[in-house]
Amino acid sequence: MPTVNQLIRKPRQTKPARNKVPALKGCPQRRGVCTRVYTTTPKKPNSALRKVAKVRLTTGIEAVCYIPGEGHNLQEHSVVLIRGGRVKDLPGVRYHILRGVLDTQGVKDRKQRRSLYGAKRPK
């Protein structure tokens, strides 16, 4: 353990914070092309088939992204916009695909929280 004098001469160094979304390179969103669209199963207490896509970003990085909402039109070579935000029960999924932007259609018949799912206002 250092003495008080040693700490005055050379204070403790703080560890740099770990970046939670490295593929975005400091940007709010990034564009990419789907290389694979598939389903995967969540961690232990939960059970489902979660829709995910592997996306090659404009930065050249491959990221696994979650496709939110019910039903989607994504397939290989679809151009998508991704944002940060992990999915707690899917290990390795740190990004979300934005609905209603580029090749991704919005969720049909969505009444509430429409802006998150790219749904137009119902008539």
Curated annotation (Swiss-Prot):
It holds the Pfam family Ribosom_S12_S23. The keyword RNA-binding applies. With S4 and S5 plays an important role in translational accuracy. Interacts with and stabilizes bases of the 16S rRNA that are involved in tRNA selection in the A site and with the mRNA backbone. Located at the interface of the 30S and 50S subunits, it traverses the body of the 30S subunit contacting proteins on the other side and probably holding the rRNA structure together. The combined cluster of proteins S8, S12 and S17 appears to hold together the shoulder and platform of the 30S subunit. GO terms for biological process: translation. The keyword RNA-binding applies. Keywords: Methylation, Ribonucleoprotein, Ribosomal protein, RNA-binding, rRNA-binding, tRNA-binding. This is Small ribosomal subunit protein uS12. NCBIfam families: rpsL_bact (TIGR00981). One of its GO terms (molecular function) is structural constituent of ribosome. It comes from Phenylobacterium zucineum (strain HLK1). The lineage of its organism: Bacteria, Pseudomonadati, Pseudomonadota, Alphaproteobacteria, Caulobacterales. The gene is rpsL. The modification 3-methylthioaspartic acid is found at D89. Part of the 30S ribosomal subunit. Contacts proteins S8 and S17. May interact with IF1 in the 30S initiation complex. GO terms for cellular component: small ribosomal subunit. Belongs to the universal ribosomal protein uS12 family.
